[in-house]
Design a protein with these regions (language model features):
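Alpha-helical solenoid repeat scaffolds
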Residues: 1-194
């Protein structure tokens, strides 16, 4: 801590903090972590800070908002250290269906079908089935999509899946695009994205 105070504001302090705070989190020394916290883009450290706040009785409305923000913006898999944060968020009623869908959408945009499936757990059965279909399509487009609801989310997922297919097999994508465009009402812009 003395090192951080001595070199506060310098790059060396930031580098030291990014190495030292994960060790503090592994020891579950929450008060030390919170006392030496500085905002960071490191998702693992952000989850550790949220865990520290929750463990010290500071899981307030701001905590909920920050945990939800971390969840919704993560289109890719998150560190295991975030699992406890999201479990508490679920227990406190902060993990809404709309929030789950936001992460499903972000994961689709990132081309991460496994994250889509994981984010969808906890949705009502019909929504879970649709989200699973969406994830399967992003993984490998199929004709099942022709029966999806004709809404913006379906169009977005179809565009994401077809973009991925276009990288691997442009000819197949070119042949299949018209049927998806017609069935789901893809706009000219969405078709051009593919």
């Amino acid at each position: 801590q003395a090192f951080l105070k001595r070199y506060d504001g310098q790059a060396v302090a930031s580098t030291f903090r990014s190495v030292w705070l994960p060790a503090v989190a592994r020891r579950q020394d929450w008060s030390t972590l919170l006392a030496n916290w500085a905002p960071t883009e490191n998702v693992g450290l952000r989850c550790a800070q949220l865990t520290a706040r929750q463990a010290t009785g500071k899981a307030d409305a701001q905590w909920t908002s920050e945990a939800q923000d971390l969840w919704r913006k993560a289109g890719k898999s998150l560190p295991d250290g975030c699992d406890a944060v999201f479990a508490v968020l679920q227990t406190q009623g902060g993990m809404t269906d709309a929030l789950r869908w936001e992460r499903v959408d972000a994961a689709a945009d990132a081309g991460q079908p496994s994250v889509m499936r994981s984010a969808a757990r906890g949705l009502p059965a019909a929504d879970l089935a649709l989200a699973t279909d969406y994830a399967s399509f992003v993984d490998a487009p199929s004709a099942k999509a022709l029966n999806w609801p004709r809404n913006e989310r379906s169009r977005r997922i179809a565009t994401d899946g077809l973009q991925k297919l276009a990288k691997a097999n442009p000819d197949a994508t070119e042949q299949q695009l018209p049927q998806y465009a017609q069935a789901l009402g893809l706009s000219a812009d969405q078709q051009a994205q593919v």
